[in-house]
């Protein structure tokens, strides 16, 4: 699997698109808003920002969320500017980054014809992997990234023994768990090294990563949602609808870290100070437009399955082909509903606010 080419959320605006099924991601951005506001406020109140404010959203995806975070950041700065009595807005440079397969066209079609901020705002698309350099040195003042850094640059090497699974699970050999962790360490270190060159001294980063509280890498806190998809695929293997060999070669390029693991990589790389780190949670039932659940477990399970389909379909399509898609997601939906009827399932988020050290 060539992750750079295959990994992207389902584009367009159809029923199963990411644009129509990214409500939980929007709520996570809202949950982290106090941390993001505190970081941008501290940045703008100091002497790092003068006439230009460069903000990058890494892993912006498409749909309504692509502009949500940066819009909120600009609003915060404008409110603060007026309170501080500063006459002129900074010129805003906004960089929206994702892998080349992202639906950037949809983002730019959604832009307002005229800026609705007092200052000048320049918006740029930046296709490419954030596991590499994206910007010149000392370009950025603020980086935001939400629900992106759990994706790895590649499927870990040496996990051929992960048969019957598509991700980390309690049935995985220890070697598989170790391989996933090693890939996370390599990727996260590279991410931090690249950003250290691109962010100005005193600049800020707020990163929200799908993760876990537990130090158990195979904890259901982070792995259950993929285990249920593996069960749906294995049902189809047992019925002869999917080749077992093909199933055994499919693995999700993702690692959901604990706060301890994230902190360890930041301290090891050494270019950023940790201003704040915490874990939060959000229930699966929040995969609705209003985010309050409140429907039947069947409705909630259906919404979770659609949210996950918008994320996972491009990966499945590339490996298994189109013929299995409707069947596997129908089975997946039923398994999700069954699990949600028995327990309050939730996602764990690791949120970290960082300050670029002076060289």
UniProtKB/Swiss-Prot annotation:
Chain positions recorded as substrate binding sites: 18, 21-25, 147-151, 255
InterPro entries, per database record: MeTrfase_7 (IPR005299), MeTrfase_capping (IPR042086), SAM-dependent_MTases_sf (IPR029063)
EC number(s) given by UniProt: 2.1.1.274
Reaction catalysed by this enzyme: salicylate + S-adenosyl-L-methionine = methyl salicylate + S-adenosyl-L-homocysteine
Recorded consequence of changing residue 147 to S: Decreases activity 2-fold and switch in specificity for jasmonic acid as substrate
EC class name: transferase
Residues that, per the record, bind Mg(2+): 162, 248, 250-251
UniProt KW keywords: Magnesium, Metal-binding, Methyltransferase, S-adenosyl-L-methionine, Transferase
One Gene Ontology term from the biological process aspect of the record: methylation
Binding residues for S-adenosyl-L-methionine: 18, 59-61, 65, 96-99, 129-131, 146-148
Role this protein plays: Catalyzes the methylation of the free carboxyl end of the plant hormone salicylic acid (SA). Converts SA to SA methyl ester (MSA). The volatile compound MSA is hypothesized to act as an airborne signal that triggers defense responses in uninfected plants. MSA is an important chemoattractant for moth pollinated flowering plants.
Listed name of the protein: Salicylate carboxymethyltransferase
Species name: Clarkia breweri (Fairy fans)
């Amino acid at each position: 699997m060539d992750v750079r080419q295959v990994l992207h959320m389902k584009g367009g605006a159809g029923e199963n698109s990411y644009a129509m099924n990214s409500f939980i991601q929007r709520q996570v951005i809202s949950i982290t808003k106090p941390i993001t506001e505190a970081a941008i406020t501290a940045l703008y109140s100091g002497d790092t920002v003068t006439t230009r404010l460069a903000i990058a959203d890494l892993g912006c995806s498409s749909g309504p969320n692509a502009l949500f975070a940066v819009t909120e950041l600009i609003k915060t700065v404008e409110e603060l500017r007026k309170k501080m009595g500063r006459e002129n807005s900074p010129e805003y440079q906004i960089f929206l980054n994702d892998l080349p397969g992202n639906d950037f066209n949809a983002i730019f079609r959604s832009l307002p014809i005229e800026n609705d901020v007092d200052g000048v705002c320049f918006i740029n698309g930046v296709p490419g992997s954030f596991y590499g350099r994206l910007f010149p040195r000392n370009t950025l003042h603020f980086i935001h990234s939400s629900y992106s850094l759990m994706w790895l640059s590649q499927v870990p090497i040496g996990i051929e023994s992960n048969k019957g699974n598509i991700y980390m699970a309690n049935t995985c050999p220890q070697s598989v768990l170790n391989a996933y962790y090693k890939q996370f360490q390599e990727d996260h270190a590279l991410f931090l090294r690249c950003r250290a060159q691109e962010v100005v001294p005193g600049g800020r980063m707020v990163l929200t990563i799908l993760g876990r509280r537990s130090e158990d890498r195979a904890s259901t806190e982070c792995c259950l949602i993929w285990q249920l998809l593996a069960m749906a695929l294995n049902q189809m293997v047992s019925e002869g609808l999917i080749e077992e060999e093909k199933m055994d070669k499919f693995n999700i390029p993702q690692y959901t870290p604990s706060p301890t693991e994230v902190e360890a990589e930041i301290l090891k790389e050494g270019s950023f100070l940790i201003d704040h780190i915490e874990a939060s949670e959000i229930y699966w039932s929040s995969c609705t437009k209003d985010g309050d659940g409140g429907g039947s477990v069947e409705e909630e399970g259906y919404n979770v399955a659609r949210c996950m389909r918008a994320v996972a379909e491009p990966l499945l399509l590339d490996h298994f082909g189109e013929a299995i898609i409707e069947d596997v997601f129908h089975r997946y939906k039923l398994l999700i509903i069954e699990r949600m009827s028995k327990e309050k399932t939730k996602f764990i988020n690791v949120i970290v606010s960082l300050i670029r050290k002076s060289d």
